[in-house]
Amino acid sequence: MSFPILTVIALLPFVGGVITMMLRGAAARATGMVFSLVTLVLGVYAFIVGVNGTNLSETHRWIRAVGAWYALGGDGLSLTMILLVVILVPVVLLAEWHVGDDETARWSTGAFFGLALMLEGLAIYCFAATDVLLFYLMFEATLIPMYFLIAGWGGPRRGRAAMKFLLYSLAGGLVMLFAVIGVGVHGGSFLLSDLAKVDFSGTIGKELFVGFFIAFAIKAPMVPVHT
């Protein structure tokens, strides 16, 4: 497919998020919901054509110095996860329709809806990325909207919870960064299609596995590294 459907699906919530954060009240709710529903329609379309064999891959040179690519793609698993994301976000927005009416909230309805849309875009990038470095950057970028969502609409100790979440996640991200660098150095590429041909058996494979496992265990979070 020549049309960059995955890029559009990922960027549309960002555009919607920026616009929604400038609005308040009913206008913010309506705008956020419209963008989430349009993203839902495009996500369902991408899922249908993707699982029926259409090639949705997008590959462009990105950071030449390190051999990184702006590469997106979709197989049965990643498209299913993207479909789940685009379905869940409108449900979340409906469930929190009156979030701005809560006197305990720190920011407006537009801020909540905008952050939720931005988080949706980053999640879609994570599931569509076929370049390890691109995945890492999008995965870590989710910390930004997550931090503000927790700090703005969390429980009574939300400030402390948000900071604790951020610090734990950054620690896990640092471990993952070393693993990502190791993959790039050993594999000579960050593209999954190239890395699939590389032999990661032996000590290097075990070390990289441990690095990614620790990072994802913290992100999950899994016992005993949960907060």
Predicted regions and their residues:
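Structural signature of hydrophobic alpha-helical transmembrane segments
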Residues: 1-12, 76-85, 132-145, 202-218
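Alpha-helical transmembrane segments of multipass membrane proteins
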Residues: 16, 20, 39-42, 92, ...
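Helix-loop junctions at the membrane interface of multi-pass solute transporters
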Residues: 18-22, 94-108, 147-156, 182, ...
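Alpha-helical multi-pass transmembrane bundles of energy-transducing inner-membrane proteins
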Residues: 111-118, 122-205
